[in-house]
């Protein structure tokens, strides 16, 4: 389930951002695919998606069998990381800039790097979120300008 708290054209919806609540599992790859669909209709030439993540995709629903892998698999660990990284690459291939603010365990640092590469800022406290997002935005502006 992907809940839009504020639409691109919504001029008065800032307060709804605070309606967010964690509701269970996080199938990151699917959420990224959904964001890609939403961003296609966004009225802008350039798109930047910044995520707050623990880099630990996990879902109770298994990954369905495919031609390469005939058995279903759990959506956690390496399969979840691989799926999420593939969706990040797909968004970037569509021209959507993807960056992440990582607030997770030390054991998840390799996953964060595998998924987001150099477009990543780590924070240890939530009060560092705005500064980290600001740095990522500045990096993107510099890259687009240079």
Regions picked out by a protein language model, each given a short descriptive name:
Residues 1-146:
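Acidic, glycine-rich A-domain
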């Amino acid at each position: 389930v992907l809940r839009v708290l504020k639409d691109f054209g919504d001029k008065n919806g800032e307060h709804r951002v605070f309606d967010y609540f964690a509701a269970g599992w996080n199938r990151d790859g699917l959420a990224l695919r959904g964001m890609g669909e939403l961003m296609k209709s966004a009225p802008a030439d350039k798109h930047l998606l910044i995520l707050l993540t623990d880099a630990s995709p996990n879902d109770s629903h298994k990954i369905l069998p495919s031609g390469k892998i005939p058995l279903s698999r759990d959506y956690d660990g390496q399969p979840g990381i691989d799926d999420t990284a593939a969706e990040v690459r797909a968004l970037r291939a569509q021209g959507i800039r993807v960056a992440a603010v990582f607030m997770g365990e030390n054991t998840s640092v390799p996953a964060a790097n595998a998924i987001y590469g150099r477009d990543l800022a780590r924070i240890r406290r939530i009060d560092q979120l705005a500064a980290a997002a600001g740095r990522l935005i500045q990096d993107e502006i510099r890259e687009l300008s240079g």
